[in-house]
Amino acid sequence: MQSLLQLKHYPLLTSYLEVLSTQKLHYMLRIRSIARPIVRRPWANAARVTGISGTRIQVPFPSSVRWYSDREPQTEPVVKDEESEHVPWYMRLEDDSLKSLNEDISKQHEVRLPDDCPDSLHILVKHLQKQLALRDILVFDLKNQRLADPENYRLKMCDYVIICTAMSTKHCERSYVEINKLLKNEYGVSGYVEGQVNPNDEKKRLKRLARKNNLGRTNIRRNALNSTEESSWYMIDCHVDSIFLNILTENRRYEMNLEELYAPLNEKHLYEKSEHSMHINTNNRSQAFDSLEEEDNVLLALRKLAQQKRQYSTESPARSLRNELVKENFDSSKKLLADNPELREQLVKVAISTIEQIRDSTGASINTEKWYKFVSHNVPLVIQDTTFWDSYLKFLLLLNDCNSQTYSYKRLIPDYLVTKRSMGEELTADDITTFLSVISERVNPQNYWDLVKANTQVVEALRLFDEEVIFTDAILSKVIKTLTTNSNEHKLHSFYEVIKFLVWKYEKEIPINTLETILKTLINFGEYDYLLRLWTTKIGYNVGSKDTRPWKVFLKAITETQDVELIRLIIEKGCLLDISRGKVDVDPQLAVLLKTAFKTVDPENLIYNDQQRLLIPSSATRQ
């Protein structure tokens, strides 16, 4: 009960406390504290105890001094600045002079942005400068540079490139995380990064190096020149407005010198490394290596290796091959092909461009035999390029064009046609067309015996082709042209045999172009009688049936000659009357050809007037 009534710790109780006594007092106590002035009297602090029976007693408490006030403190209302609540205390500027100083510093590091650049570039650069504290920010506009140099593939990577410097690898990593947050919040995309090194992987790398005998007692992290902590490069594809961001440490930025790569042509000189700066940088690196202990012999060996002369080439193998072929160093070229088997697929195209370069620039003659042996012996056995045979034929024709004496057109048959067929490839119509064009244009026989020799090669080539390829209108017309000279002075006796064979083969329905070639050839050689026999009997029509012969082709070949005797012979022999007998449809084109033929032999229209009215209906004239 005494412990219950010790209320000196509660002098201002305004509530009632009900306590149930379990042993001596079997009644409920109601206690209310009364606040008294602070007076040092033993009975100052007391409580009225009222039992259930109604008896009131006064219980004294030990005196105590009140060390607090029951009055509410009177304070002035505090006016809170909404802007200051969100600004940390260490970033608040108490003086206007400091604020102006900060503005001056920001103006000194103002970033120059391209004209008409997107808003995302402004936001990103501002975030890099203000929030991430990245310095030396440069922005290059590759979009406008592409307009001046559209063939430069370096400028097709993106539209804008940002280059900035971070203080350490940790700074690079943290900057990438913050930039990725900005991209996700503002544009809903995630950037793609290259160059990010996992810290766990870096620790494993260092432990692996530490296990080496020579480096076991060495603090590897002292070598800042070879540590990723001091030489890092984060390249980020922002996926927004084709912007690429490069975050580099200072050493890495100096080493890569990306500014010279992306700068316009008129500004490249501003970012070129001077010999003095390169010399200073090399000396600093050498001093850093020398500062290591003598037991770091592996690093010293690496230093010697880095300083020794480069024993490899940075030139592409294809360019090296071209340079050797220009000098006709076939032994060195063969060694290059052995070291780089992938060049065999490009060998023919490289050889063509090299020969054309030699011929056009210097005009020097080439050794066609050595060129042929080198290319033919080094082409791949398994050919996957679909354009290989076209390039190979062009290469052989180029050799023939450079020197037709050492590389004759006759070699096209074994070197190309036979080789292609023996490797399982089908000979196409383009192959025989090209060969026949070579015979007609390049060989160009001038006498009968030259024509016989050329025709022998034609027959040998035709034997390699299938009938489906040969018996086409375009091929047959070219074959017939090879039976005569271009001057129309000589023709082979087999010319007439070929005509008989074609009449038998096509059953009087010879293809149009082939028939036109035959008719023109007969007219050029003055074979008028054979021409009439061919037209009236060999490819004639059956009496009583419809005439389906190509009259337009026949009359066109005749009227183009302007030969009065030939046209008069055809009219007087009654050949044109077959148009009426065979019920040929006379359209306006055929009517014009008939009028031209009659006008050539009868300008005044007096002799063949009746025949003209019979053959040309009035309906065709009105049309």
Swiss-Prot record:
Question: What keywords were assigned to this record?
Answer: Membrane, Mitochondrion, Mitochondrion inner membrane, Transit peptide
The organelle transit peptide extends over: 1-68
Q: Does the keyword Mitochondrion apply?
A: yes
What cellular component terms from Gene Ontology apply here?
mitochondrial inner membrane
The record's principal subcellular location, in a coarse class, is mitochondrion
Q: Per the UniProt entry, what are the Gene Ontology biological process annotations, in alphabetical order?
A: mitochondrial gene expression; mRNA stabilization
Q: Where is the signal peptide?
A: none
The record's listing under InterPro entries reads: Atp25, ATP25_mRNA_stabil_dom, NT_sf
Subcellular localization, as worded in the UniProt entry: Mitochondrion inner membrane
Superkingdom as given in the UniProt entry: Eukaryota
Q: In the UniProt record, does the keyword DNA repair occur?
A: no
What membrane topology is given?
Answer: Peripheral membrane protein
Tell me which Pfam families the record gives.
mRNA_stabil (PF13929), RsfS (PF02410)
Q: Which PANTHER family match?
A: ATPASE SYNTHESIS PROTEIN 25, MITOCHONDRIAL
Q: What does this protein do?
A: Probable mitochondrial mRNA stabilization factor.
* Family that this chain belongs to: Belongs to the ATP25 family.
Q: Which named protein is this?
A: ATPase synthesis protein 25, mitochondrial
